[in-house]
From Swiss-Prot:
Organism: Arabidopsis thaliana (Mouse-ear cress)
GO molecular function, one term: DNA binding
Primary site of residence: nucleus
UniProt-listed GO biological process terms: regulation of anthocyanin biosynthetic process
Binding partners and assembly: Interacts with BHLH002/EGL3/MYC146, BHLH012/MYC1 and BHLH042/TT8.
Protein name: Transcription factor MYB114
Cleavable signal peptide: none
Any one cellular-component term (Gene Ontology): nucleus
Domain HTH myb-type residues, every copy: 5-61, 62-112
Keyword presence, Nucleus: yes
Amino acid sequence: MEGSSKGLRKGAWTAEEDSLLRQCIGKYGEGKWHQVPLRAGLNRCRKSCRLRWLNYLKPSIKRGKFSSDEVDLLLRLHKLLGNRWSLIAGRLPGRTANDVKNYWNTHLSKKHEPCCKTKIKRINIITPPNTPAQKVDIF
């Protein structure tokens, strides 16, 4: 079982590990992640290899600041989809779900959260005697 494996490296990746992973993916392609650590000669678990590739090393990943068009699209998609980062990232070419989530949390969440959530207030309606009180949601 992978979780009980001892001696697997954790923490920051080295440039050498990144290079080994790139070479392995270049030779064998993406997928079959359970074989990647052995093929690449890495002392990492398969999940760590997969996430490192998908979130940092994959050549199609965009680096740098989000453009104003990307920010605008992110705002509209978040209003529509909520915190479904994978779905949102799928509509922002070159951006990973992790990038999108981190950008939202560091740049946009505090500015745009109030407009995206409808506050519900519960109030008691005054009713005639001998009838149960009613609770109504007010938006």
